[in-house]
UniProtKB/Swiss-Prot annotation:
InterPro entries (alphabetical): ArgE/DapE_CS, Bact_exopeptidase_dim_dom, Peptidase_M20, Peptidase_M20_dimer, Peptidase_M20A
Matching Gene3D superfamilies: 3.30.70.360, Zn peptidases (3.40.630.10)
Species the sequence originates in: Aspergillus flavus (strain ATCC 200026 / FGSC A1120 / IAM 13836 / NRRL 3357 / JCM 12722 / SRRC 167)
Protein name: Probable carboxypeptidase AFLA_037450
Keywords: Glycoprotein, Hydrolase, Metal-binding, Protease, Secreted, Signal, Zinc
Compartments it resides in: Secreted
């Protein structure tokens, strides 16, 4: 392991930014600054007084919609270099990235240590960009912890990114030899190309260098025992175009696809023994969402093609098993019409439900329905036992992709404490 990271260190130093944005400072300096629990003059005063909240503000203010993560990546990399981390900017290629704007993952660890505990989240966001703002209308008794911070990424997942960094700095202040690694990836919102690039690289060796991986996503400060699996596909129908005044001269792809869509839409509510998708006590029902339908060219033309995008959240079973169920459902609903079929090759492979660890006391436990980068990181076996995986973070997924994305100061501060608790538990297992 040490030889791998020595080689990587040389590469990182060669590629280091020529214009660091922060003055050098040792790790052993106070890093978190909690606002006073008393009165305050303005929300801006509270943010400015806290290095942690100021850092969160700074990264939320940088637009980083998927494929445009370069600037926020450089900001985070410079911040960590200034605090004596070895920083590796791992290039991640994308056909949609902006010209001259290289995308990269940020992998960082204290310069004197080989990381054994990996702390990770993502730095990309969904569109559109929403500027950073503060709201004190909901504060109670002039309590700074109730200040609401809004903006794209304030929750998903820059809240986790900021809290993870400052939790790590807190731990390193007390224990400079803690073997921590920080990984902030691109592209989580669009398929996980950043995490897959890391997973397939020498930075993720076999056997695993990491005995613990802590993932950051909005979990409302609960420790997640697992999340549903995922399968994406299209339902495709082929017809024959004709003038709408003479529809018998053509074949309507829309008419052909409707029975298949109706059947697929209900698969999560149909018992598995009757041809539906499986459920489980832990995750409940598998859910199906027909998110987009594209068909026809005009109202006066019999449609020759129809395509529907479908997302399935798997509560049990494997993607291959679900594919077989979908194929049978489409075939049965259309009486075996060969012009209507499920197309799986245009979507990613999918993954089964992901079970996670919850053996650290002091957290509420929950499951979630959304997808994460957890399945995109291949976990290699270790001789000393299984690699533990945790999923935790501040904020709610219910606002994460909406125009009301927001988080409170109190939740951000509690997340630092939560991540520190997870890190300290991992250190005790060394």
């Amino acid at each position: 392991m040490k030889s791998i990271y020595s080689l990587v260190l040389c590469t990182a130093l060669t590629a280091a930014s020529p214009h660091p944005a922060f003055p050098q400072s040792p790790l052993g300096v106070p890093t978190t600054s909690s606002p006073s629990t008393g009165t305050f003059n303005s929300a801006e005063e509270v943010i400015n007084a806290s290095p942690f909240l100021s850092f969160h503000r700074d990264i939320v203010q940088i637009e980083s919609i998927s494929s445009n993560e370069h600037n926020v990546g450089e900001f985070i990399a410079d911040f960590l270099r200034a605090r004596n981390f070895t920083v590796i900017e791992q290039a991640v290629t994308s056909s949609s990235q902006r010209e001259n704007q290289e995308r990269f993952n940020v992998f960082a660890y204290p310069s004197s240590n080989t990381p054994e505990i990996l702390i990770t989240s993502h730095i990309d966001t969904v569109p559109p960009f929403i500027p950073y703002s503060l709201d004190t209308d909901s504060t109670t008794d002039n309590d700074p912890s109730t200040i609401r911070i809004s903006g794209r990424g304030s929750v998903d997942a820059k809240g986790s990114v900021a809290a993870q960094i400052f939790a790590a700095l807190d731990v390193l202040e007390q224990n400079p030899s803690a073997p921590l690694g920080l990984l902030f990836v691109v592209g989580e919102e669009t398929g996980g190309d950043g995490m897959r690039a890391f997973s397939e690289s020498s930075l993720n060796p076999a056997p695993s260098a990491f005995h613990t991986v802590i993932f950051g996503e909005p979990t409302e400060l609960a420790l997640v025992s697992g999340h549903k699996g995922m399968l994406g596909f299209e339902i495709v129908a082929k017809g024959h175009a004709a003038h709408s005044g003479y529809p018998w001269l053509g074949r309507s792809a829309i008419s052909a696809v409707l029975p298949a869509l109706s059947r697929v839409d209900q698969l999560g509510n149909i018992p598995a023994d009757k041809g539906g998708l499986p459920s489980s006590p832990k995750y409940g029902n598998t859910t199906v969402n027909i998110g987009r339908v594209d068909a026809g060219v005009a109202a006066n033309v019999v449609p020759a093609t129809a395509r529907a995008d479908v997302a399935v959240r798997l509560a049990a079973g494997t993607p291959d098993e679900a594919r077989d169920i979908v194929r049978r459902a489409v075939r049965d609903a259309t009486d075996g019409n060969p012009d209507v079929y499920a197309e799986f090759n245009t979507r990613s492979e999918g993954y089964p439900p992901q079970d996670l660890d919850t053996d650290v006391d002091g957290f509420d436990i929950t499951t979630v329905n959304y997808g994460t980068d957890v399945p995109n990181l291949q976990i290699h076996e270790r001789e000393d036992g299984p690699v533990r995986r945790y999923l935790y973070g501040p904020g709610s997924i219910h606002v994460a992709h909406g125009d009301n994305e927001a988080i409170t100061v109190g939740d951000l501060q509690e997340a630092v404490r939560g991540y520190r608790k997870l890190i300290e538990a991992a250190l005790q297992r060394r």
